[in-house]
């Protein structure tokens, strides 16, 4: 992991968090998956064993280099990683008529933005697995997504830092 890359610092709870995200997605091996705000690619790499293909997008170039290296070192061939703004990436994918079956999104504390979410909705994933570290921006983004036809099916908090107010939340939305 490069010094400028983000990674969860609590490995025990991180494993629980990511396994819950994979469980919520209920992948069968046939899905096309996008891992947005993918960091070093951990969620996408885990999902790759349960999906047909995974595309990861991340703004931080060091994290993308780490994701590519992680895929290579683990001999994972059904994953591609791209460096760029997630909203712009999704907008371009939607404009080209691309679709996906499952979207994993793990945005920074500021949450996602309307450009990203509108493009995601246009691409029409059956399931969105949203991982959030900020309940306020999660509520804001869920409001947007539910107005666009998605329903919240499951919510699971994961305590990453005991005895603090910080919590990660995994949410499953579907149409």
Sequence positions of predicted segments:
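Rossmann-like S-adenosyl-L-methionine
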Residues: 1-175
């Amino acid at each position: 992991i490069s010094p400028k890359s983000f990674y969860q610092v609590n490995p025990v709870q991180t494993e629980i968090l990511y396994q819950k995200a994979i469980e919520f997605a209920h992948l069968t091996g046939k899905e096309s998956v996008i891992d947005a705000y993918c960091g070093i690619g951990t969620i996408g790499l885990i999902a790759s064993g349960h999906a047909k293909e995974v595309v990861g997008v991340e703004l931080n170039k060091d994290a993308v280099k780490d994701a590519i290296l992680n895929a290579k070192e683990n001999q994972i061939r059904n994953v591609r990683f791209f460096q760029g703004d997630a909203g712009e990436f999704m907008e371009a994918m939607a404009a080209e008529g691309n679709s996906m079956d499952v979207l994993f999104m793990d945005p920074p504390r500021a949450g996602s933005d309307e450009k990203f979410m509108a493009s995601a909705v246009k691409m029409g994933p059956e399931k969105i697995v949203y991982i959030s570290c900020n309940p306020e921006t999660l509520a804001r983004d869920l409001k947007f997504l539910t107005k666009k036809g998605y329903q919240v099916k499951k919510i699971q908090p994961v305590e990453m830092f005991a005895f603090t107010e910080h919590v990660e939340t995994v949410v499953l939305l579907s149409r």
